[in-house]
Structure formats: structure tokens, C-alpha cells
Design a protein with these regions (language model features):
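Conserved HGGG/HGGXW glycine-rich cap/lid loop of the alpha/beta-hydrolase fold
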Residues: 12-64
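Short beta-strand/loop motif that positions the catalytic acidic residue
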Residues: 199, 205-207
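Short alpha-helix in the alpha/beta-hydrolase fold that links the catalytic acid
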Residues: 42, 201, 215-224
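Flexible "cap/lid" loop of the alpha/beta hydrolase fold
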Residues: 104, 108-109, 115-146
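Active-site loop/oxyanion-hole signature of alpha/beta-hydrolase fold enzymes
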Residues: 53-94, 252
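Hydrophobic, aromatic-rich cap/lid helix
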Residues: 2-4, 165-194
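Acidic catalytic loop of the alpha/beta-hydrolase fold
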Residues: 210-214
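Catalytic histidine-centered segment of alpha/beta-hydrolase-like enzymes
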Residues: 238-247
């Protein structure tokens, strides 16, 4: 698996890494919990027919600046800057988990910035009748099974690769968790349901049928709230980060929607 081209942009004066690979029309990817400490097979599949641009959210691996973001509005505006500076304004956008919530915000608040939209188990809603789990309150040994149907997929994501700096790597992983918590703790509820009706982009909502973090029933809540043409698909044998569990199936569904 060849590596992407790495560039850096500044958001609020702090560096954010941008990975680019592939050919064809642009598609952006905002990663879920854990971010992108490494390039993924899922992104390689997309890159066969698309130019994949994957910017790191503030605080995620390859980026800093999350400690300057004190409100949800701060985060939304930072992501808007990131989308612009990564060259993704007007492009199709895929967002997963916490990245999915921000992708939805972009489509709602800045509709001209998003072409077609894919949301993979996005954060942003909360139903006290079917509460989401709190990923920041879990023991380390529980977390892999909460993130993926196959916990080994999560472990592989966060395990230092050969040659990684043994000091820097765990700091980046901890910082990614802290950044997501700053944006979404404790329950991931940003009142996004109030803004879903502003989304006019054609939208695909994907959800792993074994998501132990966000109930799969939330997919219908998103579909019901979004104003644009919306379709829901379930990914079999996949957990919260379905693109780790089933990269080929998720990539096929994404590419079919993007056309």
C-alpha cells in the first residue's frame, strides 16, 4: 500500500496535516474516533477512482490547536477553515463518527461547501430512550470492542508501527481522545437535530449493524431529519468504525452513492 502525499495547512495558526492520494474527482474524509494515525485500506479503495483528501481535525494525529477551541461554534468554524485550506470546498464529503458530525454541520451551515454527503455513524444526536455509550468512560480493554465488531481492527489502528517514536505515538493517541472529548463529551450531543433540516445535499447514512457505541436506530433519526434525498444502509458485521471492520463494503457503498 503506497503512502499518500503529505501537506500541512494552518487552522487558527496551528498546523493540521492533510493526506492526499488517488485520481479523479475530489472526496474529503473526516475520520472518526482515533483519527488517522495511519493510512487505511478503506481510503485506498476510494483512491482507485477518486482523489481522496483526508485532513486531520485539530488535536487528531498530525494536527494540533484543539486546546484553543472552547465552544462547539469554535470547532465548526475550525473545520470550515480546514475544509477550505485542504481544497475541499464544494467537494463530496465523507465523515465518520465525530468526523461525521462535523461533516453534517458543514452541509447544514455551509451548503455550498458540500457536494454529496456520506455519514458513517455520526455523532451529534442523543436519545435518552436509547442512550449512546460514553467512549471516554471506558476501560482500555473494553474500548476495542466498542469501536469495532472485530476489536483487533481498533488495536491495529492505534498500535505503533515499526519505527514509530515510542514517546510521541502514545501522546498523539491521547491527544486525539482529548480532542474528541473537548468537542463531544460527555454524550456526543451537539443538538445537531436542530440543523439537520438545513442539509439539502444528497446523503447516504451508513451504520454498522454491530455498533455498540451509537445505537443503529440513530440512522433513521438522521434520515428523518435531513431535508435532502437520504438513504440508509446497514453494514453487516461492522461496529462503530465500520470503515475499519468492512473497508471494501463501506468503500463500495460510498462510491455507489457518489456516482
Amino acid at each position: 500500500m503506497s503512502q499518500p502525499v503529505t501537506t500541512t495547512v494552518e487552522v487558527n495558526g496551528f498546523p493540521c496535516r492533510v493526506w492526499t492520494k488517488g485520481k479523479g474527482p475530489k472526496v474529503g474524509f473526516l475520520a472518526g474516533l482515533g483519527g488517522l494515525p495511519r493510512w487505511l485500506p478503506f481510503l485506498d479503495k476510494l483512491a482507485e477512482t477518486r482523489t481522496v483528501i483526508a485532513p486531520s481535525l485539530p488535536g487528531y494525529p498530525g494536527a494540533t490547536g484543539h486546546t484553543e477551541l472552547d465552544s462547539h461554534l469554535d470547532w465548526v468554524l475550525a473545520v470550515r477553515q480546514l475544509i477550505d485550506k485542504a481544497g475541499l470546498a464544494g467537494a463530496d464529503l465523507v465523515g465518520a463518527s465525530v468526523g461525521g458530525a462535523f461533516a453534517a454541520e458543514m452541509a447544514a451551515i455551509f451548503p455550498a461547501h458540500v457536494g454529496r454527503l456520506v455519514l458513517i455513524a455520526p455523532f451529534g444526536l442523543f436519545d435518552d430512550q436509547e442512550p449512546a455509550a460514553d467512549p471516554w468512560a471506558q476501560r482500555r480493554d473494553v474500548l476495542p470492542g466498542l469501536m469495532c465488531a472485530d476489536g483487533d481492527k481498533w488495536t491495529a489502528l492505534v498500535t505503533p508501527p515499526e519505527g514509530a517514536n515510542s514517546v510521541v505515538w502514545p501522546i498523539e493517541m491521547s491527544r486525539a481522545s482529548e480532542a474528541a472529548a473537548r468537542a463531544f463529551w460527555p454524550l456526543g450531543n451537539t443538538r445537531l437535530e436542530k440543523r439537520l433540516g438545513l442539509i439539502a445535499a444528497p446523503t447516504l447514512v451508513l451504520w454498522g449493524d454491530r455498533d455498540s457505541l451509537l445505537p443503529p436506530s440513530y440512522a433513521q433519526k438522521f434520515a428523518k431529519g435531513i431535508n435532502g434525498a437520504t438513504r440508509v444502509e446497514t453494514v453487516p458485521e461492522a461496529g462503530h468504525l465500520a470503515y475499519l471492520d468492512q473497508p471494501d463494503a463501506v468503500a463500495r457503498a460510498v462510491l455507489a452513492h457518489l456516482g
